[in-house]
Amino acid sequence: MGDGRVSDPVTTAEGVGEFIVLAELSTALSSRLAGWSSDGADPDTSATMASLAARLGEHAGWWMDRIPESVLLEGERTAASGAGRLTDVLALLDVPPSDRRSAVAPVLDRLVAYLGVLSERLSPIGDAPALRTIRLVLADLKDRPR
């Protein structure tokens, strides 16, 4: 819509859930990729994994910064934290060292696609900081493995 209105906009409570899940996912991916970068099992991808791990770790902080501090949203924060989806995503990375690059590529592709969908649900004015964060994350992931 050209008038700034968004169909099916994200509520503040939904935003809390979205940003917590994104922060936890980014943290978990960062940890996994950092481990891969230093375990010596696949020297050919260690630099790529280290770079991605550092960026994803930084993204986690950016997502946490998007979460409003309010006792009124404590239930949403608790409900979103530790969501079961994280286990399923990380299971996709349980692969032999030689398959790491090909395993991480679709996970990051899905993250990029998800951020595109989320950005369409955010208001260009009220959610401008979140949209900026999405743009920064997408720019950081442009050189991801494919």
Where are the model-predicted features located?
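Acidic/His metal-coordination segments adjacent to aromatic residues that form catalytic metal sites
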Residues: 2-20, 79-107
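Helix-loop segments that flank and shape redox-cofactor active sites
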Residues: 28-54, 114-130
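Short, highly charged low-complexity linear segments
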Residues: 85-96, 111-125
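Leu/Val/Ala/Ile-rich N-terminal alpha-helices, chiefly Sec-type signal peptides and the beginnings
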Residues: 2-44
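Internal, well-ordered domain-core segments that constitute the primary functional module
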Residues: 120-146
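Amphipathic alpha-helical assembly/interaction segments
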Residues: 8-16, 45-48, 61-64, 97-102, ...
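Conserved alpha-helical segments that form or flank metal/cofactor-binding pockets of metalloenzymes
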Residues: 47-87
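Generic structural signal for well-ordered, non-transmembrane alpha-helical segments
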Residues: 20, 24-27, 50, 54-61, ...
